[in-house]
């Protein structure tokens, strides 16, 4: 009987070593989610900073001859400051970039010192949703301006300008694209942290 008990004890010990305990598995899953959260926030910072720099440098001056007056050439500048929608996108990129920096630091501390309280995680979800809405609205507004600059609008007699201001339009288009990526990243962060809250509530 002693031999059987010893064998059973040894077998159960092997099973314990082979399968991790539920708390250990939960901690590993939590760290995995936190790592994904940190990677997305670093990506968000890089994207918003790049979009901010690209949009802030969106400026071009072209020399356009006046057909009615031979020899007269006008210097016509194009700046992002000329459009309220582009200014809105710049502000949205700026505040989202600052938020991504703060949230990246917070997530790094969470990885170092353990999981954060559910209340803090819930606030993080709310902020992610808030900034996702800001970025989506700003990107949509700027995208409308960029489309008119690219294609024009014959119904309102708005002429396209991208055939003249090529560099300026490339900057605007790139910043709108980066703003769209930032919006998608924020949505992914919202889903990820909402899933973390769901795991804790089970």
From Swiss-Prot:
GO terms for cellular component: plasma membrane. Its main location: membrane. It is found in: Cell membrane. This is CASP-like protein 1D1. Residues 1-37, 107-119, 193-202 are cytoplasmic. Belongs to the Casparian strip membrane proteins (CASP) family. The chain crosses the membrane at residues 38-58, 86-106, 120-140, 172-192. It holds the Pfam family CASP_dom. NCBIfam families: A_tha_TIGR01569.
